[in-house]
Design a protein with these regions (language model features):
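Short linear sequence signals and composition-biased patches located at protein termini or domain-edge surfaces
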Residues: 2-5, 14-20, 32-157
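Extracellular protease catalytic domains of secreted zymogens
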Residues: 28
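Short, surface-exposed charged micro-motifs
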Residues: 9-11
Length: 157
């Protein structure tokens, strides 16, 4: 018998921060094929307030021959609607984190821009993160962006 199928998902949640309230956290959960949790969701990184992903594809349409490289970036809904899931070569993701202590001396932040790739005309971009409260506008923010190549897709060309 083989191992059961499982989906690992990451999401932004809040956890209790004792008497000071709550703190944002990047959480991880394993979901079994039958829809049950493998274990309780676990916090991975405190301070995470946003995450986004774009998918590097080899041509934005099946009408064009594959090149063996990444020619465009797409959102997942664009990948699905164009039926090019087999052409996804990488996942480019961004995680926005913030400090846990607000300081009135910090400059007011109305938006946190996230650098986006620009390979082809019409490529989507990451959406800036917008602080939701006055206190959040006085936090300091960091954007972490990384790209992960999908090995089987690259070598299976």
């Amino acid at each position: 018998a083989g191992a059961a199928a499982q989906l690992i998902t990451y999401y932004v949640a809040t956890i209790s921060n004792g008497p000071s309230g709550t703190a944002p956290v990047l959480a991880r959960a394993g979901i079994n094929a039958d829809g049950t949790f493998d274990a309780q969701p676990a916090p991975v990184a405190v301070g995470a307030v946003g995450r986004q992903a774009l998918f590097g594809v080899d041509c934005a349409s099946n009408a064009t021959a594959a090149t063996g490289g990444i020619t465009n970036y797409r959102t997942w809904s664009q990948v699905v609607s164009a039926q090019i899931a087999g052409r996804v070569r990488s996942v480019l993701y961004a995680v926005v984190t913030r400090t846990l202590q607000t300081d009135a001396r910090n400059p007011v932040v109305n938006a946190v821009p996230i650098p986006s790739p620009n390979l082809g005309t019409g490529d989507p971009t990451f959406t800036p993160f917008y602080p939701r409260t006055t206190d959040e506008q006085r936090d300091r923010y960091t954007v972490h962006v990384a790209e992960v190549a999908l090995r089987n897709q690259i070598w299976g060309n």
